[in-house]
Amino acid sequence: DNPNSQIIKYLVNRGAKFEVHDEGYSGRTPMHFWARRNNYELLELAIKGGANVDMQTLLDPKSEYNETLLFEAVKEAETYRVTQLLIELGANVNFITPTSPLDNAKGSRNKKLLKDAGAMTSAQLDKKYNIYWDSEECEKDESYMEKYCKL
């Protein structure tokens, strides 16, 4: 065990969820940074300890552009182990922002992992579910947002 994982285990055992968003520009949680930096060991500890596998960034609470941990993981080809872990732990591979994780995936391993898990592009999701994006309406009307802005 490295010192960081020991600290995370300690915090998880005391109820930490690592779901506090950075109040600055990024709106990310520690888990988003771990996903982007290929730190699958800390992510696994946090998620198995009860953290949300589909935790979103929080740039704007009414924005449909909030991304999950999987979006962070697939942005780098080297993070395929994090991508695999998140899929194994139940991440939604078809979360749409209006782009999907598959649209954003870098590297053949990430793309293969997503496709094998049933991921679709945003165009495929739009066609299958007849999704209509009106971001202006999503920002104004919360009931519209709940019905049409999230899959």
What does each of the following model-derived ranges do?
Residues 3, 38, 77-78, 109:
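Ankyrin-repeat intra-repeat helix-capping/turn positions
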